[in-house]
A protein has these predicted regions:
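Non-catalytic helical/linker scaffolds that mediate oligomerization, partner binding
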Residues: 1-169
Length: 169
């Protein structure tokens, strides 16, 4: 199925087995902007098979890669570790999946150097985090509301994982 030319193609690297597989996908979609989603400290299968260092040659060679989401961001240190390695043309997107990440959202977003600030919220993982920490379930929705309000007040784009587009390529 062809995608419209203005689609930003998200690639969840948890599901890409090798760097060669990623390279093949990127070649196939060379005319689309690419949003890479790098799982770090993943707690559910599949496990990530490579690091940001493994990806740097690819990120530097494929200029259509515009965004890099990094999962399980809980502090500004999580952002700085990766951001210092990225070329300036890549927008780093911290992916928030825990109450701790929401509690630290100001320092996280302040540490992102990109002009356009974007964060990503994974509802499912946030819910699991609330359950795992034996927090009241009401904390889940309250935390989402806090994050939404923070983003509105600070001009930050909030991407919310609410659905998936499936593809066989």
């Amino acid at each position: 199925m062809p995608f419209p030319s203005d689609v930003i193609y998200r690639i969840n690297l948890a599901w890409i087995n090798t760097v060669d597989d990623l390279t093949e996908i990127l070649r196939k979609h060379k005319n689309h902007k690419i949003f890479l989603d790098l799982p770090i400290r993943r707690t559910k299968p599949p496990e990530n098979r490579y690091s940001i260092d493994n990806l740097m040659p690819i990120i530097k060679n494929f200029l259509n890669i515009r965004y890099l989401a990094v999962s399980n961001v809980n502090s500004r240190d999580d952002v700085l570790d990766i951001q210092n390695k990225l070329p300036d043309n890549i927008t780093l997107v911290p992916k928030i999946e825990s109450i701790l990440g929401i509690e630290n959202i100001k320092s996280i977003t302040d540490s992102v150097k990109n002009k356009e600030k974007i964060i990503m919220l994974d509802h499912d993982d946030l819910y699991r985090s609330v359950e795992k920490d034996n927090e009241p379930i009401s904390r889940f929705q309250n935390s989402i509301n806090i994050l939404i309000e923070f983003c509105k007040e600070n001009g930050i784009v909030l991407l919310r994982t609410r659905g998936v587009i499936f593809s066989d390529d």
